[in-house]
Amino acid sequence: MSKRIYNFNPGPAALPLSVLEEIQATFLDFAGTGMSITEVSHRSKPFDAIINDAVTRVKRLLGIGDDFKVLFVQGGASMQFAMVPMNLLPDGKSADYVNTGTWSTKAIKETKILGKTVNVAASSEDRNFAYIPKELSLDPNAAYVHITSNNTIKGTQWADFPDTKGVPIVSDMSSDILSRPLDMSKFGLIYAGAQKNIGPAGVCMVIVKNDLLEKANTGLPSMLAYKTYADSNSLYNTPPCFTIYAIDLVLKWLEETIGGLEKMDAVNREKAALLYDLFDASSFYNGTADADSRSLMNVTFRLPSEDLEKRFVEEATKNDLGGLKGHRSVGGCRASIYNAMSMEGIQALVDFMKEFERTNG
């Protein structure tokens, strides 16, 4: 096998090596068909088994039953910024949105473009999105409360979800889906672009409660209506079969290799602690998120100067530590440590950071 680096890119991101190896082994002959998964019909029995297995595994991991539908939708999380209000926000009602960064800002913008009424229930923009708000001004009559569970750019994450007094939470979980157990009774809909934590790019997983589906707005274009996907098992048109196959393998890895979401959460906390403990003991590395809002998925930090940050990224890359440059909108550095990032990768990064501080501090 050719050399592989430790991939800290924010998305598309690292996949479990065992998943990549299984894809490699089956790529030319999928399930004894004599065809690649990229050639198999989405109407075939072999692919039907894949998509059904993926749905079953998601439900098992999250502990949900037939009161939820699991959908595979194209267009990424960005399309969900519009699909959510199109389907779930009736005329004459408003929705609560909590603004914690770039992606929730975009979700608010798309909702307003549709002429829908938005109540910004809280925002952390006053301090450049460095924290998760604790005080929310929620409307008890809102159609839903929209939350971005993890903020990849600023490195913040909801540690606990708010009590919305029965109003369903709609959450963009693109960057922390299936990284920890969830109390699914709080959620009406979860959406997650695949390319950060559950697979390659090309599909957005939507987990939606049946009661929201049943009262969803009608008169929408077919491809923008959740009901279309729910009624067709996400096979209304040709889905990205390869991506869904890879997602199914990642779900299998989560269940059978990791042992479920509680164990995944424990591993993720241990990984993040190695980096945050380093920050807390150093005056050279400074985390950008408030301590009580730190993300377990995206660890953002600054060095004493931009020149040092540039050198840090360059030298890290030479040491097979890739993808550590911060988002172009904020600069700095960022280590994305999703489920698939190994403890060995984190330790290699910590060792490099200590040596870089020793020689440049």
Swiss-Prot record:
Subcellular location: Cytoplasm
Binding site for L-glutamate: R43
Catalytic activity line of the entry: O-phospho-L-serine + 2-oxoglutarate = 3-phosphooxypyruvate + L-glutamate; 4-(phosphooxy)-L-threonine + 2-oxoglutarate = (R)-3-hydroxy-2-oxo-4-phosphooxybutanoate + L-glutamate
Signal peptide: none
Cofactor binding remark: Binds 1 pyridoxal phosphate per subunit.
EC nos: 2.6.1.52
Enzyme class label: transferase
Record's keyword terms, sorted: Amino-acid biosynthesis, Aminotransferase, Cytoplasm, Pyridoxal phosphate, Pyridoxine biosynthesis, Serine biosynthesis, Transferase
Superkingdom to which the source organism belongs: Bacteria
Cofactor(s) the protein requires to work: pyridoxal 5'-phosphate
Record's subunit section: Homodimer.
Family to which this protein belongs: Belongs to the class-V pyridoxal-phosphate-dependent aminotransferase family. SerC subfamily.
Protein name in the entry: Phosphoserine aminotransferase
